[in-house]
Regions:
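Non-catalytic signal-transmission and effector/linker regions of two-component phosphorelay proteins
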Residues: 1-52, 58-65, 86, 116, ...
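Acidic, metal-coordinating helix/loop segments flanking the phosphotransfer/catalytic sites
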Residues: 77-95
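Acidic catalytic/metal-coordinating carboxylates
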Residues: 79-80, 106-110
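Conserved phosphotransfer cores of two-component systems
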Residues: 87-91, 113-121, 141
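Receiver (REC) domain active-site loop signature in two-component systems and cognate sites
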Residues: 102
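Alpha4 helix (beta4-alpha4-beta5 surface) of REC/receiver domains from two-component response regulators
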Residues: 109, 130-145
């Protein structure tokens, strides 16, 4: 139903025309909103470096991205190396926070694979394993950090900032 508003007698109200205008206006606004959101995403990815977390522990995957976002980073999390490798995030990631022990492809295995694809990608390992041999191998293969869980947030944030600054 069309609401009638007072108008002068020289103009007429064409409901078909108004309905089509409303549809076109709605489509235009939806398009403008989509373009704005896309533009914001593009700007966000330029202004906010993507830090990716790969860890099989759900609590880490939930908490670390939230922490990173609070401090101005864009963040994504993956439950496995395989999931990360098949995502669009590999080429966009500017710093990788990586668990050492995961089912399937381990953190050290993923590090070796990424060195072939993205040799400059800084990797910070986080682990519950107090194994000096693993730490030594990770650092020898180019890791920029090796932190024990539970990770202290200020230490992790400093490691991320240093990794991004140096790369």
């Amino acid at each position: 139903m069309v609401r009638c508003v007072p108008h002068d007698s020289s103009s007429t109200l064409n409901t078909d025309s108004n309905d089509h205008t409303l549809v076109r206006l709605t489509a235009y606004l939806q398009g403008a909103h989509s373009s704005l959101m896309e533009s914001n995403r593009d700007r966000e990815s330029i202004e906010r470096p993507l830090v990716t977390v790969v860890d099989d522990d759900v609590s880490v995957r939930e908490s670390l991205p939230n922490l990173l976002r609070q401090f101005g980073f864009s963040a994504h999390a993956f439950s496995s190396a395989e999931e990360f490798l098949t995502s669009d995030c590999v080429s966009q990631t500017r710093c990788l926070i990586l668990d050492v022990v995961m089912p399937g492809v381990t953190g050290l295995d993923l590090q070796r694979q990424l060195k072939l694809r993205s040799p400059a990608l800084p990797i910070i390992f986080i682990t519950g394993q107090k194994d000096e041999g693993i730490r030594k191998r990770a650092l020898e293969q180019g890791a920029v950090g090796f932190l024990l869980k539970p990770v202290i947030s200020t230490v992790l944030l400093e490691a991320v900032n240093v990794a991004l600054r140096e790369n």
